[in-house]
Curated annotation (Swiss-Prot):
Subcellular location as annotated: Cytoplasm
Gene name of the encoded protein: sigA
Record's compositionally biased regions (Basic and acidic residues): 71-83
Region annotation Sigma-70 factor domain-4: where it falls in the sequence: 303-356
Keywords attached to this entry: Cytoplasm, DNA-binding, Sigma factor, Transcription, Transcription regulation
Function field: Sigma factors are initiation factors that promote the attachment of RNA polymerase to specific initiation sites and are then released. This sigma factor is the primary sigma factor during exponential growth.
Main location per the UniProt record: cytoplasm
Record-given protein name: RNA polymerase sigma factor SigA
Amino acid sequence: MSDNTVKIKKQTIDPTLTLEDVKKQLIEKGKKEGHLSHEEIAEKLQNFDIDSDQMDDFFDQLNDNDISLVNEKDSSDTDEKLNPSDLSAPPGVKINDPVRMYLKEIGRVNLLSAQEEIELAKRIEQGDEVAKSRLAEANLRLVVSIAKRYVGRGMLFLDLIQEGNMGLIKAVEKFDFNKGFKFSTYATWWIRQAITRAIADQARTIRIPVHMVETINKLIRVQRQLLQDLGRDPAPEEIGEEMDLPAEKVREILKIAQEPVSLETPIGEEDDSHLGDFIEDQEAQSPSDHAAYELLKEQLEDVLDTLTDREENVLRLRFGLDDGRTRTLEEVGKVFGVTRERIRQIEAKALRKLRHPSRSKRLKDFMD
């Protein structure tokens, strides 16, 4: 089977094919060879958004055509035996005590024989919750084995296991032993589906809808294929032609597919700087503007000091020089206990004084 395995992994899926097209191809191949590998099915269908009814329909089609499902490592349809290494941490992944305890705990659960699976499935059909729990517990290590393959895609190892367990529960609820498939074969699809869906929903900082993730994956496949064919990066127009999309839509999808970069990303050989240090704050004052503003404040204070206390305070309130809030003549009049007209007169006199060349020349340079 190893030769076939290599051939399968080297095959390029036409990115323009629909879900039904890919399913038909798989069924045709299964008819010729009498079986399909579970890994091949997962690889071909992983980029499509498939609901439970569609997947059950596909399994029914395989059963109707007498196509058996096998493991890629072993073309016989025997029970899958997980190695002790399947319960170890993935390379480069540190696990904490709760995860270590969980892996140790599920390692103590005995695996089921094919006959035991059938007996439990029969009891589950009768609504036996204990049988449902037993079937799920016996396959928890299968979830760990599959979750390890998705490490490094934006989710923690424990989160991958938890999502896979949700898929396992769904498989337990939907498993039909009458179709002739082993439970592990049936459950593997649902575990993979749950994990890949979670990665699409949760792994990104900015969530992208699953249907858009499928479109992005399709675009990436087209992009890679064109890169091989053309020997260069394809233009949006070329990608759009293959996908039957306008170039502007391709650019929009490529923009959505971009991953955000943290402003705390280390920069430099010694990681002593961060990306945010080199990004301009367009809302902040430039150093020259800030310096000019401070000089203006100093000059204005000096000029105001040449007025009487009442004139200075009236201007400060009228123009909001202290707190940025301007006041009406009436509001200022209430502060000083005089009429609006009197405040207007005081203000006019103060402004005339400021317009005198001896004072105005000190502020004129700031008028440009």
